[in-house]
Amino acid sequence: MLPSKTYDLNNVEPDWRCMLSKADSRVPISWRNWLADAGSLTERLMQASDGNLRVSVLKQGFEVPRFSERQLLGLADRRRAMVREVVLYGNAQPWVFARSVLPLTTLTGRLRKLRQLSNQPLGELLFKDPTMCREPVQVACFDAGNRLLPPSVSSIDQASWGRRSVFRLDKKPLLVAEVFLPDFHPYHLA
């Protein structure tokens, strides 16, 4: 069941809202467990795919993040950040589109290594870091065919659910958004 109002991303970002709990009635029951999970999505997808998880980098570079991303990260309007977009494939199926925004001030010192992730899942590093703190999860419903997702995944013909969180490593922020794609069926994998 999808909410009565989904969001046309041709012109606007989705309506990101804090997920109150795993019992949040705005979210379909089949999605709640995955969207509210506080652990590593990478680890959970590895288990669900029996270790057959692959990361495909769609793009990585420096750009001005979207308005809501800048707000969450406390970035000035024209401040650039490293933006990385990937698709996580489980059992050779596209399961999750992920977009990470890392401010330049985060990519210093020992965290410079985040510039060189290649095909390594960011979640692997985040959840192994003893300084990692995660802020509350926000969730949103994405309309089919939205334009904020890259063309390789925006041709989906049904609405999808996503979540995002600000993480802090050494008190430095980074944002991770994850959108579950139609080939991912949470009710089969809960």
Model-derived features: positions:
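N-terminal domain-onset segments
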Residues: M1-V83, V87-Y89, Q93-N146, P150-S155, ...
